[in-house]
Amino acid sequence: RIGGERAFQLHDTYGFPIDLTLEMAAEQGLEVDQAGFRALMAQQKARAKADARARKGGAVATEVYAQLRRDGETQFLGYTDLEAESRVLGIVADGVLVDSAEPGDTVEVVLAETPFYAESGGQDADTGQILGSGLAMDVVDVQKPVPGLYVHQVTLTDGQLAVGDRVSAQVDAMNRAGACQAHSATHVVHAVLRQLLGPTATQAGSYNKPGYLRFDFSSASGLGGLKEELEGLSNQAIRDDLEVTSRELPLDEAKALGAMAMFGEKYGSVVRMVEMGGPWSRELCGGTHVARSGQIGLLSLIGEQSVGAGVRRVEAYVSQDAFRHLARERALVTNLTELLKVQPDQLVERVERMLGQLKAAERTISDLNAAQALARAADLAGHARDVGGLRVLTRQVQVSGPELRTLALDLRGRLGPASVVCL
């Protein structure tokens, strides 16, 4: 038996794919601790995310963030409000605490209260503006470099910003609405996957932003012919206009209710559970969501693929992006039907027939080229010279790879074993 730690070392240190480890182990009658491998991979992903957040927020500012955090947590108001009056607690520039910032500066701002959602749980951060008296700044990113502290990356466009300023934080409502649609659609996809594949189809990762979602799940074989059913059942759940609610409760109680947790994720004793249609979908989630599934609008599946041993990925467009995706596909089908002069339901058959004809034509051309090359063999053989007891033939010919091999072998046969042919 190959332990999960050894399989992970082969993958992480030596770049040996887990798929190949599984295949070679099976050939030798050995088992691989896949659960242990996945646990170590989850830990690595968590470390990578933490490192990415540190780099995004400025790793050198970690102690600065910790210092600001000791002065108090940021109160997040974004579940209910998209605007909030607040106070500037700190300004960070290039990893150093500063007292003020000028127009054109890009700095990080910590507020006492914020409606801005910080990137986490696979959901992109909010964008928007922070305004004050003669003051304006664009919020381009929000991170939580240390627990409880929301750090807003801003570009100051007007006025001078100072610690202690009273400001109004305003989230881009359209961008937030798109993020809510995509995140709720991710929960829909998760619930339908478990409905189709069973309880082993657990979440292995996700990413969602306005108009798009990506969802990784545990599965050995993937969806196969169930892709259309996944899309159809997901859109049925959207049309059912299921109520989406959230509540905080003890972790043990949430698990007893069947709430799904992200593999490898760490949770506190009290968690936030998001429900969609009551027990139909229950997940531990800190993200923002629509009030009802009907607000998602539409989901259009892009495709499914393998992203590792026992892990599959589905991608989909959501809401207006889904409608635009379908419109592009319809335009493509229309162009093809006009070009090939067939009905839409005959497209696959026509293309398959054309591909078959193309392959047959390529084989015919290859056979003709080979015949022409062989027809030249007798003439070419006549140009062979005797060199030290060997029949040597060197010639430049214009033929493709397969025909060149056929011609060379024919000439070797004509000239005998004591010959050298260089074409």
Label every PLM stretch briefly.
Residues R1-L423:
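A glycine- and charged-residue-rich anion-binding loop/surface
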